[in-house]
Amino acid sequence: MRIATFQLRSRLADVEGNIRKADALVGKLDRMLQGNGKGKNLDLLVLPEMAFSGYNFPSLKAVRPYLEPSEAGPSARWARTVAQKLGSVVAVGYPEICPSTLQDNLSLHAKTGEDVQDERRFNSLIVVKESGETLVNYRKHHLYYTDDPWAHEGESHESGFFSMPLSTPSKQQSIPKDDSGDANVGCSPKNEIPTTVGICMDINPYKFIASYSACEFATHARTSGAKLVVLSMAWLTLLSSKELSTMTDKPDMDTFQYWISRFAPLFLPDEGGVEDSSGEVAEPQVIIVFANRAGEEEGQEGKDTARYAGSSCVVGIRRCPRKVGDDDDGNRVEILIWDMLGATEEGICLVDTDSTPRMVGSVKI
C-alpha cells in the first residue's frame, strides 16, 4: 500500500489558512508521486484530527462557528476534491454538527434528566473514496478533556470498521472467503483491505477510568480482523517549547513508544499455540497509520497552550511466533517503521508498505 499523512501546524480557528496549507501539501505530494518512478497511484491520505478548525477550543461557544454539517462542510468538500484529484481514499478530521433524533433526545433525557437540544455534535473523521462517496463518517468514542465540553460520544469503535478499496494490489489485501468463512485460496485477492479508524484519545482507556490493560480500541482492531488501522490525531506532548525547538526532524520517541504500547493486544499470537514456519520473512499482520499534527495552539478563555507531539508515522506489527524446535520459550514481535516525521515538522509522510522499512524494532512477549 502507498500511504501518506499530512502533518499540519494548524492555527486555531483559521479554516481558510489551514486549507491553504493542506492545498500546498497536495501539490507537493502530487509531485512526489509523479517523481518516484512508481506511478502516481496512492491508496490513502490521512489528515489530523480537526485538521482545518484546529483543536484547542475551550468551550461549545468557542467551537460553534467552526462546526460543520455532517459530511457536507469545508472538510468534506476538500476531502472529496482531493480524493478525485489523487485517485485515492482521503480521511480528514472535523468538528461535526447534525440534527438530533427523537430517539437521541429520549435517550439523553433518560440518562441525564436534563433538557435536550435539537442538535448533536461530534469530533469526527470523514473517509471518502476516489469517487467522492463516503466510506465512513466515524465519530470519536473516547472523548478527551478538550472536546468533552462540546462533543457527544460516538456510538462505538466498531462503527469505524469498513473495507477500504486499494488503488494497487498489496500484500495486505483481503482474501475472499468461502461459505464456511475460511480463506478461499483458489480465488484472487480482492482489491481492498479490512480497515478500522479511530481518533486520538480512542486508544486510551475510556475517560482514563477504564483499566489501563483493557486496550479497548486495540482489542476491537484485533477481534474485527482489521489489517489496516488508521488514527487521526491531535496528540499532545509533555515536552516544553524549548525542548520542541530542537526537534524539527526528531520524533518524540516517548510519545511513539506509548502509542505502540496501546496496541499490545495485537502482539499476541494467533490461537493455536506453536506455529511452524517456512523460513520466509512474514508480512506484517497489521499496519497502523498515526497521523498527528504539530505546532502549538494558544488557549482561549484562559485555557492553556496546547503543544502537539507530531511524529506522524506508518508502522507494521509483525508477529514472529516460536517455531517448532526453538529453545526460546517466548514469542517475538517486530515493529516495522517505514517513515516517521519530526515532532515539530510540517510536511508529508509518504510510504510504500510493500517496500523495506527504514527501521525495525522488536518486543519479546
Located regions from the model:
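N-terminal glycine-/serine-/threonine-rich phosphate-binding loop
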Residues: 1-44, 64
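Alpha-helix termini
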Residues: 30-40, 105-106, 112-113, 166-190, ...
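Active-site beta-strand/loop signature of hydrolases that rely on acidic residues for catalysis
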Residues: 29-65, 83, 90-91, 202, ...
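CN hydrolase (nitrilase-like) catalytic-core segments centered on the catalytic cysteine
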Residues: 73-91, 204-342
